[in-house]
């Protein structure tokens, strides 16, 4: 039904129009603009819903780069505008030009799953909620990815990333359990790396910090701390320009698309994995943790390492728990 008329038109360089605001928020008054029912009806008659439906399948199965575009377009299924329809055609044109650039897996890719996550603070001007996304790669290519909008309003970018880390952790745990049930426990013998580009969110997850910035966060999101203590995941800080999940949070420029797209779909190697914050130099790469003694004792218990008791209280506690 939709035809891409290339002609002399230049092919789009990004999956969603860069710096193109399709929200109904007036930039000056910050008020929501009224809905034009006549315009919406005309756009629906053009086949806007069919357009979005046709983009959802490739987004979910073969072309993760258009996930953010589908997430944005899906928010206007009832009352679309001409600008929204134009953005959808832009995405369709980009997909056509890159139809041969799907997901790639390689035998020399990462043998253990790796998760990258990101969020864009207050990306939605109407609700002040942030968009977030994550991708889990295995054997070089993405096997789980998502681009959504937070259901809660974050007060800072660190809080948004902390909530995103928790959402991504749920899928990581599902994958770890699946691999164990399939008979591949060696693939999840080590904690799964969770790579994000916000240092504060990474620190909240790794350390037992209660600050003015995170004390109000709902308890559900602090589940991530338990996963770190149990040695199931290991958050690490990655450079923002190397975070492939950035394409799930906002409309990126053509330069960012050119840099991240091949890494996201598995056609290019992942960025260099940062050094673990728990490992000190000079110990042959062994895990030497810098957190509090209780945290260390719990980690050693998970790894079946004899704990180093430094006080009678710790000995009594370990005896009571059967360590």
Description of each model-found segment:
Residues 1-323:
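Long, low-complexity, charge-biased intrinsically disordered regions
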């Amino acid at each position: 039904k939709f035809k891409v008329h290339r002609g002399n038109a230049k092919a789009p360089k990004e999956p969603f129009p860069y710096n193109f605001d399709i929200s109904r928020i007036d930039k000056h008054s910050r008020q929501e603009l009224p809905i034009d029912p006549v315009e919406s009806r005309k756009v629906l008659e053009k086949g806007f819903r069919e357009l979005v439906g046709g983009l959802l399948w490739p987004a979910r199965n073969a072309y993760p780069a258009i996930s953010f575009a589908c997430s944005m377009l899906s928010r206007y299924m009832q009352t679309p505008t001409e600008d929204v329809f134009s953005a959808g055609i832009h995405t369709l044109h980009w997909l056509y030009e890159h139809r041969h650039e799907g997901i790639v897996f390689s035998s020399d890719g990462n043998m253990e799953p790796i998760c990258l996550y990101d969020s864009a603070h207050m990306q939605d001007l109407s609700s002040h909620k942030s968009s977030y996304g994550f991708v889990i790669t295995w054997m070089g290519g993405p096997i789980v990815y998502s681009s959504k909008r937070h259901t809660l309003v974050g007060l800072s970018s660190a809080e948004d990333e902390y909530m995103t880390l928790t959402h991504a952790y749920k899928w990581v745990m599902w994958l770890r359990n699946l691999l164990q049930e399939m008979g591949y426990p060696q693939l999840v013998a080590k904690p799964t790396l969770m790579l994000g580009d916000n240092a504060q969110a990474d620190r909240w997850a790794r350390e037992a910090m209660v600050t003015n910035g995170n004390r109000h966060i709902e308890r559900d999101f602090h589940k991530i701390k338990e996963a770190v203590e149990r040695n199931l995941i290991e958050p690490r800080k990655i450079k923002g320009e190397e975070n492939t999940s950035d394409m799930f949070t906002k409309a990126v420029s053509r330069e960012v698309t050119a840099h991240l797209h091949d890494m996201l779909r598995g056609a290019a190697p992942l960025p260099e994995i940062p050094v673990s914050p728990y490992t000190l130099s000079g110990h042959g790469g062994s895990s030497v943790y810098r957190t509090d003694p209780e945290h260390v004792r719990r980690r050693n218990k998970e790894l079946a390492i004899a704990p180093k008791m430094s006080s009678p209280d710790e000995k009594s506690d370990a005896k009571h728990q059967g360590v």
